[in-house]
Amino acid sequence: MNENEWDKLLKIHTTGRDDSNADQYRYPYEPTPYSVLERLGNSGWIRKENTLLDYGCGKGRVDFFLSYQTRCRSIGIEYNERIYAKAVENKETAISAERVDFVVVNAEQFSLPVEVARI
């Protein structure tokens, strides 16, 4: 499947690059290709009993895909409030929304939950 087909299946909108807040300290929003996520999801490294922590989650593509593919729980961390709002908006329609949470915070200030098994 291509990028748009995966987004449609997962009922999210994550395609496209966003350079609006990029500078020498912050990367632009650029979603991880689904082909990479498919390989990771099929690797067996992330399982249903795992909790995944996704630093720089953007609009939540990694979180929604891997929670769909592996049934893991996922926590997405995003510092950009505008991009975070898009992730929350995606959660309203995503098919794996019940296993995904988002937090808007600078990663340096986030306390790692004890249940997190994969980062």
Where do the language-model regions lie?
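Glycine-rich SAM-binding Motif I of class I
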Residues: 60-64
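Short beta-strand element of Class I
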Residues: 72-77
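Conserved SAM/SAH-binding beta-strand->alpha-helix loop
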Residues: 80
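Conserved SAM-binding loop
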Residues: 87-88
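Conserved SAM-binding strand-loop segment of SAM-dependent methyltransferases
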Residues: 97-107
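Short conserved loop adjoining the S-adenosyl-L-methionine
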Residues: 109-114
